[in-house]
Amino acid sequence: MRNRAGNVRGRACRSWEGGALAAGLLALALLCGCAGRQAAPAPTPDPAGEPASAPVPALPKASPETVARHEPTPTPEPTPFSIAWITDTQTMTMYPSLAPALLPTFRWIAQSREEYNTQLLIHTANFVENGWNPLHWKRINPAIALLEGELPFLPVAGNHDVAKKVLSYEPYLAQPFIAWQAPERQYRGGEGYCERFTAGGTDFLVLGLGYLSVNEAGLAWAREVFRQNDDCVGILAVHSYLSYGSDRTSELTGHGALLRQEVVAPCGNVRMVLSGHVKGNALRIENFDDDGDGQPERQVVCMRHNYQQNRYPDQVGYLRMLIFDPVSRAVSVLTCAPAQGSFTAAPDRADEEHFTIENAF
């Protein structure tokens, strides 16, 4: 079956034609020592509380026609591809001594697009320490500008971006990268955003929802977009989802509990949730029984990754490459710091920095 853009759509892959990229990504997974590792599912705990958000007006329903596809060129064959993921860059905008890491980090993301077959960069918020401080935006915007015309970008607003002075999207929505967005894919002018693309023979819908929009109207918009694009593998990108816990289990934040109940659970195509906010790394894998037959049909992978200078004094410019294998349906996670030339896991954090998740999409 083919979708409206003429790209092959489907979840099953017939074969994998090897090549330099495929071999390289497989070698990378083996080098990381992560092939076949999977965390155990975690039970659903009582969520921690989180401040309530002000209500916003609901938007008209989204439709597949309004969720237009973006560059890069789709890859209909089952070829490995990647999504780049960065979060909580706030300390690099706050401290002049750390700000020089921003340009090389974003430059590497843009320049490595072909090598990793990168389809998208997701930023799960807290771009800056204080969204009302123009100097902080001045430090990061030149780095983000390197992506323009090079790589699709899905930003999410966090509490530091919109809530340090008053609860308002005003400083965030004034940033240049919001103007890159297609209006038909925005929620309330950039408070939320979605990207639909085809890679490895599979259609994906990635949806980002800002920190102040985790409320009745914002949740309804997210739910409707996922449901109108139920032919896609869904990825939800938010700032706050996983709370404190061990590196392999985690409770939910207040926002996380709402998002799980109102979006993740009812939308049967959501397979992954990415978040930051809380410092450190966490992984939570949960199974959902969507048809009520007593047997889980859907695995949802939830990850948090947040390297900040005050948690890891020598670690700045960290990001994750999520490497999708469309044949095995596994995702290999590579945590790296290109600005430092670091692509190997720290010995004391190897299991949480380089690993593979089976049945991930």
Residue ranges and their predicted role:
Residues 80-93, 202-212, 235-237, 299-306, ...:
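Active-site-proximal beta-strand elements of phosphoester/diester hydrolases
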Residues 213, 219, 227-271:
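Active-site-proximal segments of metal-dependent phosphoesterases and phosphodiesterases across multiple
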Residues 35-37:
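Bacterial signal peptide processing site
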Residues 30-33:
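C-terminal motif of bacterial Sec signal peptides marking the signal peptidase cleavage site
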Residues 77, 320-361:
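A short C-terminal boundary segment appended to hydrolase-like catalytic domains
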Residues 46-135:
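N-terminal active-site segment of His-dependent metallophosphoesterases
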Residues 85-87, 120-126, 152-159, 209, ...:
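Active-site neighborhood of phospho(di)ester-bond hydrolases with catalytic His/Asp-centered motifs
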